[in-house]
């Protein structure tokens, strides 16, 4: 059973992000390491994705007046392509609606396979550049 809880160990969560994103950082020559990631996520709303009590992913959110920004969605390598990303997005939607926002926004590397998940989940591309798709989904 999948569940969510506030992140207790930001260092471990940052390490998962670094391990998942390292190939993208290398591809785009982004100079990030675990300490930089931890610094960036410290002020976000951080949740762990749990499977039978084991942390298998993370979501990081930021809110403004009308939008919830999915700043990061990670699923550990061994648990990818098993529905955990879709479950995490559903939790993001629930949290966004409960906060009173009417839109989810995110940015994804153009070369990321997660792009397909976001399209399947109802996100549309609002803009793009050489590295990223900026996407959003209106909430009801």
Where are these regions (language model features)?
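Conserved beta-strand in the GNAT
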Residues: 48, 54-62, 69-74
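Short alpha-helical
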Residues: 12, 56, 65, 112-113
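Conserved GNAT-fold acetyl-CoA-binding loop/helix
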Residues: 14-44
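C-terminal "cap" of GNAT-fold acetyltransferases
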Residues: 38-39, 64, 100-115, 119-140
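Conserved acetyl-CoA-binding loop-helix of GNAT-fold acetyltransferases
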Residues: 75, 81-94, 119-120
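A short beta-loop-alpha structural element at the N-terminal edge
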Residues: 1-15
């Amino acid at each position: 059973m999948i569940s969510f809880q506030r992140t207790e160990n930001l260092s471990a969560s940052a390490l998962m992000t670094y391990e998942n994103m390292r190939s993208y950082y290398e591809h785009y020559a982004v100079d990030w390491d675990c300490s930089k990631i931890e610094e960036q996520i410290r002020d976000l709303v951080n949740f762990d994705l749990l499977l039978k009590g084991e942390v298998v992913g993370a979501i990081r959110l930021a809110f403004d007046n009308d939008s919830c920004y999915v700043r990061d969605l990670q699923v550990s390598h061994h648990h990818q392509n098993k529905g955990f990303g879709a479950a995490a997005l559903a939790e993001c939607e629930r949290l966004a609606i409960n906060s009173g926002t009417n839109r989810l926004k995110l940015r994804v590397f153009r070369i990321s396979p997660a792009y397909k998940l976001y399209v399947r989940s109802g996100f549309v591309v609002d803009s793009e550049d050489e590295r990223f798709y900026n996407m959003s989904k209106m909430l009801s």
